[in-house]
Amino acid sequence: MGPRGRQRRAGTVQSTNDSSSLSKRSLAAHGYVRDPFAALLVPGPVRRTPLIHRGYYVRARAVRHCVRAFLELTSALPSRTRAQILSLGSGSDSLYFRLKAAGLLARAAVWEVDFPDVSRLKAERIEETPELRAQTGPFKIGDSASSLCFESADYRILGADLRELQRLGEALDGAGLDATSPTLLLAEAVLTYLEPSSATALIAWAAQRFPDALFVIYEQMQPGDAFGQIMLQHFQRLHSPLHGLELFPVVKAQRQRFLQAGWTACSALDLNEFYRRLLSAEERQRVETLEPFDEYEEWHLKCSHYFILAASRGDILSETPVFEPSEASFQIDPASPSGFLSARVVTSDHQHSSLKRYGHASALLSPGVIFSAGGFGEQEGRHCRVSRFHVLSRSCDSEWEGCQISTLGTEGQWDGRLYHTMTRLSDTRVLVLGGRLSPVSPASGALQLDLYKSKDNCSEGQNVTVTKAALEEGSVLSCWRHSTTEVYYQNQRYLFVYGGRSVAEPVLSDCRFLHVETMAWVRIPVQGASPEGRHSHSACSWQGGALIAGGLGASEELLSSVLFLKPVSSGFLWESIDIQPSITPRYSHTAHVFNGKLLLVGGVWIHSSSVPGVTVICLTTGLSSEYQIDTASVPWPLMLHNHSSALLPEEQQLLLIGGGGNCFSFGTYFNPHTVALDLSSLRSGQ
C-alpha cells in the first residue's frame, strides 16, 4: 500500500475511533461506568441508545477485567519491578486517567500508540485541559518530527504505524519501554482493521520482544451467519473492512493464531459468556435497570459476535489465568443435525407490498389468507412503527402474493403497537391483545380487526376496520412479549394469556383466561407447580391445552423448559415435558405442532456458536432432534428472530413471515421475502 492508501486507511479507521469514543462518553454520562475523563477527551454532547450503551458497557467491563487482573498479578512482584501497559490503537480512550485516578499506577506506567495525527490531537487535548493535566503531573509535548507526542513520569503517547514494526520498536525504545518488564499489550478493536499478514506479524513481534507479557484483544467474530453478514457489510460501507475475519472467524482460530505466533497460553470468551459468568448478579441487575430496554435479541447477538482474548507468555504471567475456569460449561450445543429442511421464497412481493417488519403478529385466517399487523418496519421510505396491515393471499395461479392495506374509515386507527398477539376469531376477524408503543408505553386496550376481502379472494380491494374490543371493564392487559393460545375447558373456547413483560415488571408469570364467546376474563383453577415467569417464549395449542417452550426468564436468563398446560376435569394442570437430549435454551422463536411433533423455529440462543434452525420434539416420547435450514435457494441473509410463522399442514409447509432487527450500530435489517420450509421429511413416525 502506498502513502496515499495508508493515509486514506488511517482516516477511515480514525472515523471508527471517533464514533467509538462518543459512545464511550455517552456510556459514562448515563451511569454505566464511572469515567469523568471521557467527556474531557471527546468534546460535544452525544446520546446513544440503550442497546449501544449495553454493547459498550460489556466491552468496557471485559477490558477492565483483563487490565485489573494484570495489575493484581504484577503488584505481587518485587517492588523494583514496574508493570507496563502498552495500548495499541488507543485513540481517545481514557484508560490511563481512570487507572491513575483509582490509584492503580503506583507501580505501573502506560504507553499509547496510534496514528501520529491522532496521538498529537490527544496530546494537545491533555495540554489544554486542567483536569487531565492534574492527573499526568509534569509533562513534555514532543515536537512535530518526534514520534513521542506526550511524556510524563508514568504516561507516554506515541505516533506510529502498527504495520511498521521496526520503527515501532525504535519508537518504544526511545520512549523508555523496557521489554524485560511484565507488559500488558492491549488492542481493543484494532487488529481486525489491519491486513491479516500485518496483524499476524505484530502478534509474533510482540511474542519475540516481550518475554513476560499478556496480550489482550477485543474483536469481532462469527461473520458467517446473518448478523455477521450485516456486521461485515457495515464496516465495508465505512471503508474499514474487517480483514481478519475470513482467516480467523471463530475463537478457536484466534487462539490458534496466538499459539502459533509464540504465545504459550491463550484463552477467550465471547461477550455473552463474559457477561453471564464473570459479572456478579448484582452488577448485572444494576445495569439492566439503568434504562428502559427491549432489544434483547440484538443485545445477545451483538455479544455473540465479539470476544475478549488473553494470550500470555513467560513464567510470571502464564501461571494465573485471566478468565477463571467454571465448573459448569457455558456451552450448550444442540445435538448433531438429523437433516436439512429446504427453504424457498414463495412471494414475488413488489416493494410497495413487501412485508419488511419485525415484532409483528400474524394469523392464518384460512388456508389461503394470512393476515399480519403491527411491528417495526419500512413504510413510505423510512423505518417506523408500521401502521399498514399486510395480507398474504393465494392468487388464481396458486402462488402467494402480498398486499399492504390501510385502515378503512374513521372509526378507529391502528396505534402502531408491536410485540402483541393476534388470534383468529373467524375467517375475517382477529383479536389483538397487549403490545407496546415503546418500552415505557404499553399499548392501550384490546383491538378487534375486521378484514374485508374481495369476492374472488385476490388481494385487490381489501380493507381493514379497527375497533376497540368489548372486553369487561378493569381488564386492561398492559404487557407485551407474552403469548395467547387457544385452549378448551368444559367444551368452551378460551384464550390462555401467559407471561410477557410490562413497564414495571421485567418478567411476568401471570395466567389469564379469556372466554371467547362472552369476551370476559374468567378464573379457571390451574394445578401443579407454577413455571418461572418468562417472556419471548413460544406457545401453541395441543390436545385442548397449551405448549409453552423457552423464553427469557428472570435476570434475562435463557430458558430451555417445555411445559404443557394440560386440561383436566377441574381446570388445567402444569406438566413439564422431559426432553432427551436436552435442548439449547432459546427465545424469540415460533412454534407449531405438526404430526405429533413440536417444532421450535429459529430464535436466539447464546450457549452455542451455531444458529438455531428447527428443533423437533416428539410429544409422545420426548425425543428431540435438530434440523438445519437449507437456505441455498433463499437470498441471504435470513434472520429468524422477531418473525412470525404459519403452518400449512395439508401442504406440509411452514411459512416464515417477516423478521429481523436493529443490528447494534450496524443498521436495521428486515427479511425481504416470505420463505417456505418443506416439512415433508418430518412424516409421522420418524
Curated annotation (Swiss-Prot):
The keyword Cell membrane does not apply. SUPFAM superfamilies: Kelch motif (SSF117281), S-adenosyl-L-methionine-dependent methyltransferases (SSF53335). GO terms for molecular function: protein C-terminal carboxyl O-methyltransferase activity. Pathway: tRNA modification; wybutosine-tRNA(Phe) biosynthesis. One of its GO terms (biological process) is tRNA processing. It catalyses: 7-[(3S)-3-amino-3-carboxypropyl]wyosine(37) in tRNA(Phe) + S-adenosyl-L-methionine = 7-[(3S)-(3-amino-3-methoxycarbonyl)propyl]wyosine(37) in tRNA(Phe) + S-adenosyl-L-homocysteine; 7-[(3S)-(3-amino-3-methoxycarbonyl)propyl]wyosine(37) in tRNA(Phe) + S-adenosyl-L-methionine + CO2 = wybutosine(37) in tRNA(Phe) + S-adenosyl-L-homocysteine + 2 H(+). S-adenosyl-L-methionine binds at residues 59, 89, 114, 161-162, 188. Residues 1-23 are annotated as: Disordered. Residues 12-23 have a biased composition (Polar residues). Keywords: Methyltransferase, S-adenosyl-L-methionine, Transferase, tRNA processing. Transmembrane segments: none annotated. Coiled coil: none annotated. Pfam families: Kelch_KLHDC2_KLHL20_DRC7 (PF24681), LCM (PF04072). Its EC number is 2.1.1.290, 2.3.1.231. Probable S-adenosyl-L-methionine-dependent methyltransferase that acts as a component of the wybutosine biosynthesis pathway. Wybutosine is a hyper modified guanosine with a tricyclic base found at the 3'-position adjacent to the anticodon of eukaryotic phenylalanine tRNA. May methylate the carboxyl group of leucine residues to form alpha-leucine ester residues. Interacts with RNF144B/IBRDC2. Belongs to the methyltransferase superfamily. LCMT family. This is tRNA wybutosine-synthesizing protein 4. The lineage of its organism: Eukaryota, Metazoa, Chordata, Craniata, Vertebrata.
